[in-house]
Every structure is written in structure tokens, then in C-alpha cells.
Amino acid sequence: MVRRIYVEKKPGLRQEARGLLHELQTVVGVSALEDLRLLNRYDVEGLDEAAFRRAVGTVFSEPQVDDTAAALPAGDCIAFGVEPLPGQFDQRADSAAQCIQLMTQEERPTVRTARIYLLFGPLTAADVDAVKRYVLNPVECREASLDLPERLAAETAVPADVETVTGFTALDRAGLDTLLARLGLAMDLEDLSFLQAYFRDTERRDPTLTEIRVVDTYWSDHCRHTTFSTHLDHVEINDPAVQAAYNRYLAAREEVYGPEKAAQRPQTLMDIATIGAKVLKRRGLLPEIDESEEINACSIHVAAQVNGKPQDWLLMFKNETHNHPTEIEPFGGAATCIGGCIRDPLSGRAYVHQAMRLTGCGDPRTPVAETLSGKLPQRKLAQTAAAGYSSYGNQIGLATGHVAELYHEGYVAKHLECGAVVGAAP
């Protein structure tokens, strides 16, 4: 049996709803919206009535600040809900289920959540659609049904046989290009041609669709830095300062690799990014660098003062950018940006104790109506990304000592989300 409860802040404590109301009226331009209420909806399966009643006042709500109800409040309003996409991690639901299990000391129940919006005023269909577009990011969530489901357990379909891409090894270039578009692959035509040659000459068979999808995923820019490894065959620079820096890079290549090897070695953005450290290492100016088979983050030997005595410690540094993930899913993208930074020194047994966030965004005051097609409003992006970063950092207990927010029209094309951490290990 599925049990349902709605939770809403008490009157006078509904700051989030008032803030969103003001934003929708002034930023989105829905002037006919007179009032707005926000409720959290919990659906629970696998919990008896007595335990459910206990959970209402201990897990789902705080009686001092929340009101609860078994049904949506009556009134002349437009109601709709937003829930995570199937398969999307629902932290609120997961935390609630864990808390209930701690409370009952029994099997963990199934919990599903949704955010319910109640809109008041003489709204047109266009007004309601504008509100939905602003609060609903289709990359991570969808509109939820207001009906009570009969069960919450996901239906498990029997998987079909894995499809073989018959004729793949015999496709000509035009055929590969058609397949590339049909499957919506991240790799380009040259990548797919390389994959075709491998299956034709080495495996001597056609690949399965799963194999192509797996290779496409791990061949993507996010996994193997495809862009940074691209060979720069022709470089044309108009800015004198940038040209001077590029000339220094060319000189550094000859110093590190030697003139003959430098001429044969491809120029890449990755090489440009790492050449400075290679030069310093070659000159013997980096004796403190720790090099081992276990390279999780940049590690430097330091003499740390512990109780007034020097001890040999490793100071670890790690940075990460999550530009595109944050662009399409601001909360999760920014959260996993700092999360990825933390993970690497943490896996080196370091205590991560300090962080930094650099972010670049377009003008958040830009009217929502001017948002480019396929993109989120800059205001929404900036605010939600900040919430995602701070959420992860606060939960793990990490102090972020420096935050810099850069606003420039160039970041409309692609958001900048850069996190960095330092940690230490004895």
C-alpha cells in the first residue's frame, strides 16, 4: 500500500515560496501570478500505518515549523508537481528512507518525492507554461502525476537480446556518417572509422550496439580529454601577447623534448597546459614533487609543524572543471565538481581541508525571455550551481575559503565551473 503526505512550511516561514513568487513575477514576467505555495510530497510503500504516522512527525516534517496534510489544500488554484527522472538519484527520498529504517529497525521502505507548486491568480495557459519552464529542467526532472500510484516499485522489464550492428564493418564513409547521426554518438566520423577498422581487422566481426555505446561513452571528451588531445596542425594568432606566450611554448618544447623530437611530437592543448611543469622538472626546480605509481593528485613534500616538531607530510592539490555538466544540470554539475576534487586526494588518504570555487556566468539580470534556445536562464544557472556546490561542501564538512564569481557575456556560450582543493597526509 502506498501512503502519501504533503509537507509545507507554516505561514510566516514560507520564505522560499515568497522568494520564488517574486522571481516569477519580476524576472519571468508572470504578473498575473498573485500567490504561490510550495509543498514537498512523500509517497511511501512498505511501511505500516503506525510507523508511517511516527515518520510524519519525525522524518518527513519538523512539527515546530511545518504543516502536514494527507491531501492537497482546497482552493481555486493550479497545481502541478515536479519529480526526478526515473533513475535520477533523489537525495531527499534516499535520506528519508534511511531515516525511517533507523527508526523502525526493519527493512528500508520505498520512498518517492515530488515538489508541488500551487499557483493562484487569473493565469493563462501561457503563464502556467512559463512557470513550468522556469522551475523544471528536463535534463534532470519531469512533471509528476498528481494521482496516488498503486505501487512505487519500478517495473523491471526483461531485457531484449543485444542488437548487433550488422554490416558495420562494410559501411562506406557515407554509411558511417549516417550511422553517426542516427545513433547520436559523441565521437566524430574519424573516431568511428577507427573503430570500424578495429572490428574489421582485429575482431573480424560486427560490433554490438552496446559495444559502440560503451566505447562512445569512454571516448567522450569528459572521459579522455578528446579536445585537449586534439593535434593542432595550424595555429594562427592575432593577439601579440598570446603570440609571445605561444613562442615561449615552442621554445619550451625544444628544451624538454629536444629539437628533433619536438618537431615530430604533435602540439596539443594538453601539452601547452603541462609544458611549464615539465620545464621546471627538467631544470631540477621541483625536488619536492612526490612521484609514485599512485598518482591521485599533485603531491608535494612539505615539513609540517606538528606539536612544535617538523614532520614529513604530503600536501595534495587537485582541481577540476565541470563546465558542461553544470551548464545542463547546475545543481548536480557543481556538486560533483567539488566532489570530484575531493575524491582524488581523499583516495590518497589525505585529509581535504580547504577549497576554492571559480565560476563564470552571463549576466544573471538578463530577462528570461532572452534565454538562448536549449539553454537555462543565466540567473537560474548561477543560483542553482552555487546551491549545488555549497550543498556538497557543507555535507562533507569542507571549508571553501575563496569564491570568485565572474560575469561576462562570453560565458553565455558555456558556463565556467572550476573547483580546487588542498589536502594533507602524513
Please report, for each region that a protein language model flagged, where it lies by residue.
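Core nucleic-acid recognition elements
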Residues: 1-426
